[in-house]
Amino acid sequence: MSDRMIHLVGSIPFRTPAEVFERVGCILGPRLYSIPDGETGERLGWMGWLEPIFAAHPQFESTGQKFTPRASGSEITGKYRLKAGVSPEDVRFDNLPFAQIAMESFREFERVKRTGALPPPVRFQLTLASPISVIRRFVADEAEQEALIPSYGRGLIDEVGKVASVVPHAQLAVQWDVASAVFERLERNVPTRFGQTREEMTRTFAAAHGMLGMGVPSDVHLQFHLCYGDASHMHSIEPATSRLLVDFTNRLRTEVRRTIELVHMPVPPN
């Protein structure tokens, strides 16, 4: 492989995973470490397409509230709450769609690899949004948000296990997207349910993502994409320096007792 590698974060504006693998492979093949399926179709909106997880979940109900993204043209989605009598500890997210989609995309990945458009070392990249981001978007009550993050995280780890039972580990990379729901709070440094100080919040967020990292089999490559958002192609808040990203990564490394193959960070604009 080339000494200068290219990392693709997730969404690629082509129509199908097959088109992503074929076109990107032909252009960037030798420089790729791993390749996502492009999050094509309805998934290009990153999280809006996940609303059915909550709308169809028997333990949730609509609040009638709406979430309006900062990005113009982005999908407006609903807000949900637990039904009366439901404890957050009893909630299971066994209706997640990620494994099924990934396994369908992996079949195309294998086919394109056989044509030679993708070099043998390139791994199939499963990219998953942090529970903190997803729960923040779809759950209205902040106390319920905090309580539901571990349950959703366990559901994601189950999805990783399903994919890892089908995709050869030597061909798989799992990337966790740690987005502005984390870093906007760290930048603003205002007390939240995740901690009264920036240091406390960093510990809380690192522990939550450490659990996700430890849910990836040790012989599957583990990646973290640290993100400040891309609404209308702008960060939700600009990092003054990379210090908070580095602090989070160092804390994360103490929580993840295995190799982290890649950490991707944004940089300050100036």
List PLM regions with ranges.
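Alpha-helix-loop-beta-strand connector modules within alpha/beta enzyme cores
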Residues: 203-217
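Alpha/beta catalytic barrel-like cores
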Residues: 1-172, 176, 183-201, 214, ...
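Aromatic-lined carbohydrate-recognition surfaces of secreted/lumenal glycan-active proteins
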Residues: 172-178, 220-234, 262-268
